[in-house]
Amino acid sequence: MKKYLFLFVTVVSLALFSGRAHAQRYLPGMKGVELRGGFANGSKSPLNYYTGFAVSGYTPKANRWVIGAEYLMKNYGYRNASVPRAQFTAEGGYYLKFLSDPTKMVFLSVGGSALAGYETVNWGDRMLYDGSTLLAKDAFVYGGAITLELEAYLTDRIVLLAGIRERVLWGSSLDLFTTQFGLGVKFIIH
């Protein structure tokens, strides 16, 4: 009996102390809610920023789809004032995981998204404070984005996001391209 008890204790000890177990991540069907924000075209003054939220889901091949919405504010200097351009866009995209560490704590993905939304310049007011008239008009915009995103798992359910994205939107009377640098947090809900 002592021999079996000793064998049992040895096996259990080896099982408990032989290595560290990690939670499984990027499983098919897992879903998360993302909150993100950052700078648009650098952090020049006046401040250009974006903020957004998204829902993402993981596929059987450890990739993910993303559906979300975003608000982008970019200011253009005019004399000693700024003229704001705001974009409200919806996004639908797919991200491919191409790199991860052995512990499955850090993942690097590249993705493409389709974007569509509305852009307003100076909140629809075409007359500036000095009597000048803006030629830029409010418009519907459409296009896409390419994103490089790093996901770092802080816990099994909380993920820190860092990304760089290049947006291209047609229909705008101002810039065609916008570069974004940002951070975010994702909460795994399923």
Say what each PLM segment does:
Residues 1-29, 190:
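Cleavable N-terminal export/targeting peptides
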Residues 21-74, 186-190:
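Short glycine/proline- and aromatic-enriched beta-strand/turn motifs that initiate or cap beta-hairpins
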Residues 29-31, 45-51, 82-90, 106, ...:
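Residues that define the transmembrane beta-barrel architecture of outer-membrane proteins
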Residues 38-41, 76-83, 130-136, 168-172:
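Extracellular loop and loop/strand-boundary signature of outer-membrane beta-barrel proteins
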Residues 51-55, 90-94, 146-148, 152, ...:
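Membrane-embedded beta-strands of outer-membrane beta-barrel proteins
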Residues 54-129, 187-190:
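Gram-negative (and chloroplast) outer-membrane scaffold detector with strong preference
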Residues 72-74, 149-190:
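Predominantly the C-terminal beta-signal and adjacent terminal strand-loop region
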Residues 123-163, 187:
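Extended low-complexity acidic/polar segments
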